[in-house]
UniProtKB/Swiss-Prot annotation:
Protein name: B3 domain-containing protein Os12g0592300
Native organism taxonomy: Eukaryota, Viridiplantae, Streptophyta, Embryophyta, Tracheophyta
Annotated region (Disordered), positions in chain: 148-215
Source organism: Oryza sativa subsp. japonica
Annotated signal sequence range: none
Domain of life: Eukaryota
Biased composition (Polar residues): 156-181
Cited InterPro entries: B3_DNA-bd, DNA-bd_pseudobarrel_sf, REM16-like
GO MF annotation terms: DNA binding
Main localisation: nucleus
């Protein structure tokens, strides 16, 4: 009797789920195994629940906030995410045993939309996926952003782990006497919220840029990260006296912090430098060291609110060059190179004096 009752309950639950539950509450996950790079199947129960309503495909909203259109095709009684999925998988660098969690959030442009969370084999969210976007995203606007889908002009929150070494923000960027200045747009915010706390730090950073009495006004194409802005005029003069820069090459200076050299760290490129000298898209950048033959191809991520290096190849560059917290790095953009190339000059401190490190 008990077993029959349980079976009846299960049938009733299945009926409620299939016939009465709002589809916007449907969730499912997929483990990336087999030939996942070219397409993945939708669980049978989920496919049945939509009852032919997803023939137009899905809109997948990635952790970065970008939306991807993916078509759905029926193959051997299975619904498979096909056209558009390969681009999604490639852009997010999906690997074997990555796990994707899909949550339906209603319709968008006539198609169902799903929020997608992406986890790696360790069970943690893949940080790089917050910085992945696509070109020609939904809505007809060209998007090359591969970071958080925020706008510099909005001056909204940025994860605190990315604030260390945070750059000038290109809210309204303009050059004053050769120095990039920014005018962030301020909006009311709850002073007790974490967003307000982060924003306060970012605004303070802007103040440090604007009020820097030691600003190097002589060089229009020199940019400084948040912590590099604390360098005095004498320190800057001493640092640049140690390196040989080609005339006309723009540079940005950063002081390495612990989070930037962690295995999942992010080195932010000053937004003024990015806006003035780099294409508004994610791309590979070649890093070189002076007087060395080695080359490092590092992924540069570009988005509305954050731009920087964040990948295993960046970590490899750190390790192979034995970079440490507190080191000063001068990234020199090599004008005239066939591909985007930066020479990285590294400076440390020994006995309270700056020294150029090989």
């Amino acid at each position: 009797m008990g077993e029959k009752g349980c079976e009846s309950c299960r049938e009733w639950q299945e009926h409620c789920y299939r016939e009465h539950m709002d589809v916007s509450r449907i969730r499912f996950f997929r483990l990336m195994t087999g030939d996942f790079a070219h397409g993945i199947s939708i669980p049978e129960k989920v496919a049945d629940r939509f009852s032919g309503q997803i023939t137009k495909g899905f809109n997948l909203k990635a952790p970065s906030g970008e939306t991807w259109r993916v078509s759905v095709e029926k193959v051997a009684d299975e619904l498979i995410l096909m056209s558009g999925w390969e681009d999604f998988a490639k852009a997010h660098e999906l690997q074997e045993n990555d796990l994707l969690f899909f949550t339906c959030n209603g319709r968008c442009n006539g198609s169902f939309s799903f929020d997608v969370l992406i986890f790696d084999a360790s069970g943690c969210e893949k940080v790089s996926c917050f910085f992945i976007g696509k070109k020609n995203s939904i809505g007809g606007q060209t998007q090359n952003a591969e970071q958080y889908h925020l706008s510099d002009s909005e001056d909204t929150s940025t994860p605190s782990t990315f604030l260390v070494g945070s750059p000038h923000k290109a809210s309204t960027s303009k050059k004053l006497n050769g120095k990039t200045k920014t005018n962030p747009r301020k909006e009311p915010e709850d002073p007790n919220s974490s967003r307000s706390h982060v924003k306060h730090e970012m605004i303070e950073e802007e103040k440090s840029d604007d009020d820097d009495e030691h600003a190097d006004y002589e060089h229009a194409d020199y940019y400084y990260s948040r912590f590099a802005n604390y360098l005095t005029g004498e320190e800057r003069e001493e640092i640049f006296s140690l390196v040989s820069l080609q005339p006309g090459n723009p540079v940005f200076v950063t002081v390495l912090q612990a989070p930037q050299i962690h295995r999942k760290g992010l080195l932010i490129v000053p937004s003024g430098f990015a806006a003035d000298h780099l294409d508004s898209r994610s791309q590979e950048i070649l890093l070189m060291r002076p007087n060395k033959k080695e080359k490092w191809y590092v992924k540069y991520y570009h988005a509305s609110t954050t731009r920087g290096f964040n990948c295993q190849r960046w970590i490899k560059f750190i390790r192979e060059n034995r970079l440490r917290e507190g080191y000063i790095c001068i990234f020199e953009l090599m004008k005239g190179a066939r591909r985007v190339t930066m020479t990285v000059h590294v400076i440390g401190k020994v006995d309270d004096r700056f020294v150029l490190l090989g």
